[in-house]
A protein has these predicted regions:
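Short, well-ordered beta-strand segments in beta-rich or mixed alpha/beta enzyme
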Residues: 49-53, 113-120
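Short, low-complexity N-terminal intrinsically disordered segments enriched in polar/charged residues
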Residues: 1-57, 61-66
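Short beta-strand edge/turn micro-motifs at domain boundaries
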Residues: 2-4, 113-115, 125-126, 130-161
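Short Pro/Gly-enriched beta-strand edge/turn motifs at strand-loop
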Residues: 84-87, 118-122
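Generic structural detector for well-ordered beta-strands
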Residues: 106, 121, 139-141
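A solvent-exposed, acidic/Ser-Thr-rich amphipathic alpha-helical stretch
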Residues: 41-108
């Protein structure tokens, strides 16, 4: 059985290992504490772009929701703060790690295409489920000596079609 807390990439695969650390534990921990400062250096601000797939298969329905990093940061903080007000009957960190899979990273030179998938959910205190079932394609670049996010197409259906 997969250990959701264990980086699937050995430290000898430095690029993939670092990308996983950035997009799984650091991202989850920052979100759960609504602390943007934990991830702010994980982005390339110049030219950043974020597409909201709206959980739709057709690209005709996708939207340029985040034309700047600041636009994404503001929405990320809004979502993180809203999440913090909710009550869950299980450990949220464990549930999010269990729901998250990131095992496919394609690297060409100083660019990477990263596939992060969510398949599961969290049980709320009232017994309802907060379903997490989407995927995100991250576009990463080796920038200033480390891997950073330069854009993404997120909230895509999982599975597609």
């Amino acid at each position: 059985m997969r250990d959701p807390f264990k980086n699937p990439f050995p430290s000898s695969d430095a690029a993939r290992h670092a990308i996983w650390e950035m997009l799984v534990p650091r991202d989850i921990d920052a979100f759960l504490t609504a602390d943007w400062s934990m991830v702010q250096d994980d982005f390339v601000e110049e030219g950043f772009i974020g597409i909201d797939g709206r959980k739709e298969v057709s690209p005709d329905k996708w939207r340029l929701a985040f034309p700047t990093l600041n636009a994404y940061r503001d929405e990320w903080l809004r979502q993180a703060k809203d999440f913090a007000t909710q009550s869950f009957s299980e450990d949220t960190r464990t549930a999010i790690f269990t729901t998250t899979t990131l095992e496919d990273i394609e690297i060409e030179g100083d660019m990477a295409l990263v596939r992060k998938k969510f398949d599961g959910g969290l049980t709320k205190s009232d017994g309802t489920r907060d379903i997490m079932q989407w995927q995100t394609l991250y576009y990463c670049r080796l920038h200033e000596g480390r891997w950073k996010i330069c854009g993404f197409t997120g909230y895509l259906p999982n599975p597609m079609g």
